[in-house]
Amino acid sequence: MRDVYILGVGTTTCGKFPDKPAHILGRKAAWDAIKDAGIHPRKIEIAFCGHVYQGMGVGQRTLKEIGLVGQPVVNVEGACGSGTLSFWEAWRSIAYGQYDIALALGVENLSRILSGGP
């Protein structure tokens, strides 16, 4: 098993964003992490995107916005632990030698979720 290092991080501010889709918020966080790492986006070999309520393909929509196309993007869902699960998957893929550079992100915008209750 190989050592794994975090090269960069990015986030959005916490708050209510009813007019911004989750993939737009995720794009900012992903781009900030890539800039913080000091790497070119095409160096990323695989990405894992954790989410719960954003529907199919949110990882692909998020990363297409910053030019990441052609690399595998795996959407993972684990309720409140979805972002952590995406990080674990990225760590595992590097630790076991499948990839050298992976991106892990969690994408959600609960301001846009309609209430399903009474």
Which residues are covered by each model-predicted region?
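Active-site-proximal alpha-helical scaffold in enzymes
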Residues: 77-108
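Conserved "HGTGT" condensation-loop signature of ketosynthase/thiolase-family condensing enzymes
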Residues: 1-73, 92-95, 107-118
